[in-house]
UniProtKB/Swiss-Prot annotation:
Pfam families: CoA_binding, Put_DNA-bind_N. InterPro entries: CoA-bd, NAD(P)-bd_dom_sf, Rex_DNA-bd_C_dom, Tscrpt_rep_Rex, WH-like_DNA-bd_sf, WH_DNA-bd_sf. GO terms for cellular component: cytoplasm. NAD(+) binds at G99, V100, G101, S102, L103, G104. It comes from the Bacteria. The gene is rex. Gene3D superfamilies: NAD(P)-binding Rossmann-like Domain (3.40.50.720), Winged helix-like DNA-binding domain superfamily/Winged helix DNA-binding domain (1.10.10.10). Belongs to the transcriptional regulatory Rex family. This is Redox-sensing transcriptional repressor Rex.
Amino acid sequence: MKTIANESFLLDTKVPEPTLRRLPWYLSYVQLLHADGCESVSSTRIARAVGVDASLVAKDLSYVSVDGRTRVGYRVADMVAVLNDFLGFTHHHRAFLFGVGSLGAALLQDSGLRHFGLEIAAGFDVNPDIVDTNINGIPVYHKSRVAELCARERVDIGILTVPIRAAQSMADEMIAAGIKAIWNFTPWRISVPEGVVVQNTSMYAQLAVMFNRMKSLP
């Protein structure tokens, strides 16, 4: 039975999703501190930098193995190591990308994803002008080879960047080929069976939120 996918792509079901969304903010900040040679940081300083309450920072960090000390704070090097590991950025994940249009091609060009543990191993499309080419050293295949290459490469993560009308059918093909987690960049809420994880990242939805918030500006 298919269900509309929850947006959660949780690393640990015991950790609230809002916490998981904030932890990368903390990581980015302490990485800057670490690069500057800072050895310790307080929850108050982290909170001020990312714009949340200090009590919330302390609560969020209680879910991971980061111990703070009274009047000293958290060891920056420990925070960087623990948060990177907890968020999965130190692990190597391989993914296939489906839909090599403007957005898909841009993601293939983004070598920075490797720094967060994600390697895009191949792209898939139906456009004959794109199939059998390489983008940033990444091969692009016809989507008819999805099942073959998923089995051969043992890839179970898919990035979905196809046009909205093709979103559900492409997701179905991905799942049939063995994809277990889908990073969905389309504005369509795809339906998936139980046991398949979906993370929806619609830029259009975020754009609508920004436009709406701008209306309240003086």
